[in-house]
């Protein structure tokens, strides 16, 4: 019996010393949720509603010199009551050298400062209108909402270190299918997107971006043919982000036909082939790590003319219960000239959110 007890104990000890592979130990699970209430008094279309803005579940890991990420999203992307679950990120990145990191898979397009910003960190009820329309969210071309992402390959890096070792220049360039997330290339023509920015002082970035490509599967209403439409875009960006002070401004311009709204695959010739927009915002601490005040001015013109400009003047607060739980509130006065009746151009908008991370 003593011999059996010894053997059992030895066997138990062997089981407790099983070594877990390093790549398994490196896997991290995280996520976040965004709960929302919105109301507006647009004449003839007043509404208010609770909404589940976003939920994401994320796996991050590392295998040698390669980082990887898989991210699934649940959202009411089509509006309240129409939930969508989809894979948004799936990529690996070779990170051995800071001056040349190579990413392959499905990930954020290399366009603008705001696009890759975490939606909670971004601090507002939504990304700016011009980002949504010209950076692959609810894209002007009619591409389905892709969260600013596509499938492809990207090279990026930080170079030109100063005397303190801080790099002064960042570059990034990518080649993508051009169709958004979870879709193969439909016309064998790739999108090329690139950008670069200088970092003259800690916390400051000044950059520019360019994008040329196409989108397939669009209907020409004149001929009835299915065609590809061009995407030629550029952006200028500036940002200061340090010690809880965040200021950012961007201007985007697009040339190329489109439907004007996500999910619509028919060219809308009436709005022309150009669009542009801009935003400027500031978020500042009122109570450090607890309460921030914010203001944003933004405009989007779907035909690059003032007769169809939509402008929002926004103010609000972000209150942090903890680092992982916050409440956001904002009020906006909206001037929407895409509404046919001039007497209905102006209305009020309110958004409140409870956001959490885990």
Residue ranges of each PLM-predicted region?
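Active-site-proximal beta-alpha loop/turn segments in soluble metabolic enzymes
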Residues: 174-183, 217-222
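Outer-membrane beta-barrel pore domains
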Residues: 42-45, 91-93, 103-106, 115, ...
């Amino acid at each position: 019996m003593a011999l059996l007890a010894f053997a059992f104990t030895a066997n138990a000890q062997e089981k407790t010393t099983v070594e877990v592979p390093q790549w398994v130990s490196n896997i991290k699970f995280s996520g976040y949720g965004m709960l929302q209430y919105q109301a507006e008094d647009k004449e003839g279309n007043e509404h208010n509603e609770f909404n589940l803005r976003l939920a994401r579940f994320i796996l991050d890991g590392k295998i040698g010199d390669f980082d990887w990420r898989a991210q699934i999203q649940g959202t009411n992307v089509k509006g309240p009551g129409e939930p969508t679950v989809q894979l948004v990120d799936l990529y690996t990145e070779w990170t051995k050298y800071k001056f040349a990191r190579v990413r392959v898979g499905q990930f954020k397009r290399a366009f603008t400062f705001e696009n890759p910003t975490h939606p909670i960190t971004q601090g507002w009820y939504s990304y700016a209108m011009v980002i949504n329309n010209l950076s692959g969210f609810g894209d002007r071309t009619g591409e389905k909402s892709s969260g600013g992402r596509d499938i492809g390959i990207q090279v990026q890096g930080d170079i030109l270190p100063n005397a303190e070792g801080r790099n002064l220049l960042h570059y990034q360039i990518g080649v993508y299918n051009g169709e958004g997330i979870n879709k193969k290339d439909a016309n064998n023509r790739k999108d090329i997107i690139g950008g670069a920015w200088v970092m003259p002082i800690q916390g400051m970035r000044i950059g520019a971006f360019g994008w040329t490509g196409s989108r397939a599967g669009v209907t020409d209403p004149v001929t009835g043919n299915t065609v590809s439409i061009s995407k030629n875009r550029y952006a200028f960006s500036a940002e200061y982000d340090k010690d809880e002070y965040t200021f950012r401004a961007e201007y985007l311009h697009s040339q190329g036909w489109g439907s004007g709204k996500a999910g619509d695959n028919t060219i809308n010739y009436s709005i022309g082939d150009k669009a542009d927009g801009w935003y400027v915002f500031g978020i500042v601490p009122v109570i450090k790590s607890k309460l921030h005040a914010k203001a944003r001015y933004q405009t989007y013109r779907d035909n690059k003319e003032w007769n169809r400009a939509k402008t929002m003047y926004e103010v609000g607060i972000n209150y942090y219960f903890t680092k992982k739980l916050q409440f956001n509130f904002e009020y906006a006065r909206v001037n929407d000239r895409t509404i046919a009746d001039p007497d209905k151009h102006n209305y009020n908008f309110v958004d409140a959110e409870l956001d959490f991370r885990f």
